[in-house]
Amino acid sequence: MELEQREGTMAAVGFEEFSAPPGSELALPPLFGGHILESELETEVEFVSGGLGDSGLRERDEEEEAARGRRRRQRELNRRKYQALGRRCREIEQVNERVLNRLHQVQRITRRLQQERRFLMRVLDSYGDDYRDSQFTIVLEDDGSQGTDVPTPGNVENEPPEKEGLSPPQRTTATLDPSSPAPGEGPSGRKRRRAPRAASSLTPELAPVQVGAEGWGQGVIKVEEDFGFEADEALDSSWVSRGPDKLLPYPTLASPPFD
């Protein structure tokens, strides 16, 4: 009786009740004890872990290392190139600064020469000199070459100051007396020429001692005229306001004896 009930119960149960719930897998036994699948997996693992896989990784590492080395060398070359360019730029800047300073110096010299030229032209015009129609001899001095005399006509527009500076000596050399030293003697000749004038200027002051009262009076008059004052001139108010205690006493000077 119980057996019949069990069979009826099993017949009432459908095939769907033995299916696995959704999201789960049936744990089926491997075919042939799993030997075929395990052998295939072991062969694949041996093939990947063999020499061919290691050589590919090694080659890839070597390529990456070579690429990194090339990049390092390129960066070093670029760095050296930029350093050389920076040094060259600094040298060019220094040269440009020196050239600019030289240009400013030349501009200052040119302006000064132009001022001197205009001044000489005004002076010569005031003297009535005909430097515009005269000829001048200019000595051109070059490095390593002798100077040559080139006569050129005077020109107001492009005549340098050196041409104008040579005109007065040429005009005055013919009027110099023979007793005066030559122009080429330099400042020493002018000093020797001043010595007699200094001695002659002292003779009127020394004349009273040798000549007498008349010479002494003339000497005193000359000194007073030179200094521009009179003996009876009144003192300033600042001197008069001082008391006798503030004035310094000076002894009276004795008159020189007359013969």
Curated annotation (Swiss-Prot):
Residues in cross-link Glycyl lysine isopeptide (Lys-Gly) (interchain with G-Cter in SUMO2): 222
Protein name in UniProt: TCF3 fusion partner homolog
UniProt record, GO biological process: apoptotic process; apoptotic signaling pathway; chromatin remodeling; DNA recombination; DNA repair; male gonad development; positive regulation of apoptotic process; positive regulation of DNA repair
Keywords on record: Apoptosis, DNA damage, DNA recombination, DNA repair, Isopeptide bond, Nucleus, Phosphoprotein, Transcription, Transcription regulation, Ubl conjugation
Residues annotated as signal peptide: none
Subunit organization: Interacts with NOL3; translocates NOL3 into the nucleus and negatively regulated TFPT-induced cell death. Component of the chromatin remodeling INO80 complex; specifically part of a complex module associated with the N-terminus of INO80.
Organism the protein comes from: Rattus norvegicus
Role: Appears to promote apoptosis in a p53/TP53-independent manner. Putative regulatory component of the chromatin remodeling INO80 complex which is involved in transcriptional regulation, DNA replication and probably DNA repair.
Residue positions where Phosphothreonine is found in the record: 172, 203
Annotated region (Disordered), positions in chain: 51-72, 141-210, 240-259
Residues annotated with Phosphoserine modification: 167, 180, 188, 255
PANTHER family the record matches: TCF3 FUSION PARTNER
Tissue specificity statement from the Swiss-Prot or TrEMBL entry: Ubiquitously expressed. Abundant in the brain.
Gene Ontology MF annotations: DNA binding; protein kinase binding; protein-containing complex binding
Gene Ontology annotations for the cellular component aspect, listed alphabetically: cytoplasm; Ino80 complex; nucleus
Entry-linked Pfam families: INO80F (PF24245)
Chief location bin: nucleus
UniProt-annotated location(s): Nucleus
